Amino acid sequence: VLLFFCLCGYAEQKKQSLVYLEHSETLSFDEKRLPDVQILVGNVCFRHDSALMYCDSAYFFEKDNSLHAFGHVHLIQGDSLEGWGDVLYYYGDTKLAKFRRNVRLLHDGATLTTDYLNYDRAKDIAYYFEGGMIEDSINTLTSLRGQYTPYNDQAVFSGEVRLVHPN
């Protein structure tokens, strides 16, 4: 009987939520060039759990529960965290969002900007590794690498860390 309960618990842990396509102006396929990929263009919107993701165009890998989003990428999670970038690689099974180029992450008045940001939605950790800046109403901090936990308001920085404060 104990083995049955252990296996049920394991099965529950392995259960993944699916990424859903909410909207796209056009949907096409190119089985020769991009097998098993949905090619989406125009006001594309995806939903994954509590997050919405918007973009101009995307490749949706439904079998892999992942997507590549391009142009005016915007992620909204709950009512207090938003992210923007030119490109987003999103992996639904791990809830990992990889933003690239012109990236901004906004949470409760703090803005993180960089060109390379990975946001682990499952662990609520955003990290950058090619230089970044975090600003709030009074401070500006720059560093080469950083790790930011938005909902705990905790951050760790390394590599040429510089803090600018009015006092």
Cite the ranges covered by each PLM segment.
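N-terminal amphipathic/hydrophobic interface segments
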Residues: Y10-N167
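Hydrophobic h-region of N-terminal signal peptides that target proteins for export
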Residues: L2-A11
